[in-house]
């Protein structure tokens, strides 16, 4: 199912937000469509308050908490540079940070309530695709932009989002293609897949399966498991029974338990090739395991190499940062929101949403907020090329092109998060 026109969708969202506002609002803080046609005046009636307020719903707790520090750092660095350059619409951008938790809690929904109560115009998050899906309707029906730096589920390409959802991370169709190609090119003709059962895990497993089998390999067993399970012995036993040459692990922090069970059942990484994904590639989750447990294990993470100069700038806002995963995507999300508000001359979500596509492609290229906003003020169209790469949003709010990094663990059960073994670039629709 293809989305309806984003312009119509945003107009619909604007009318819904206006209706909500008419029932009474709160004081601003700091810190399937198919609706009837909406008159243009409805959208025009929803205006911002003159101060762009960005909220974050990013993981401070939960199974993706290790992604929180680089994502918060990316947002903070972008806002520092934006405000140092004069802010948006002549005022400093306000920020409100909240926790996304994970799917085992209701933290994200409570955080969104807080942000909407404080009149956030755009919300950056969540990191988890399932968490984002759970809060998307609440955010977009309020006429607020939701912008994730890390969601990769293919489901968001066609989801009913009122034209207000965007992401700088690519859909899993690209990561799945790269991972499937990697598994086969490493000489594996039989593959087992252990994937967490949610939109992220199942969707990525589908794409890996398709790609690997098109390349001539056979997926001999696939197990979609409950990530909340206490143990995974039966799941691993199903994989072991089919004796694959490679095992693809798609999950979050529960992967540590899966790894322990693989070792227990004799499917160690020196006997069977393991492959991971962005959700479980971690430099903290496996440190307590015996040395070399993960030695040689490869995994994929969306995103190009974070330039060394960018990493140094990140350290100015968080000197303790050691992981840069999705920092660039968070930085670009924040910068794009600010540029879109400048282009719209309005900070409201329904006004800036259509401009997000416009500022991402088709105009004069620029690579930072200051140079881009100077071009906008001179009356020129811009094409923001970010730290994460050229964004070039398509009509679904997805980046049109993206890069996937291939990483490898060493004997200390860690990988070099600053530099991949290789980077593979591709078109999302390709």
Regions found by a protein language model. Name each.
Residues 1-18, 22-430:
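Extracytosolic ligand-binding ectodomains
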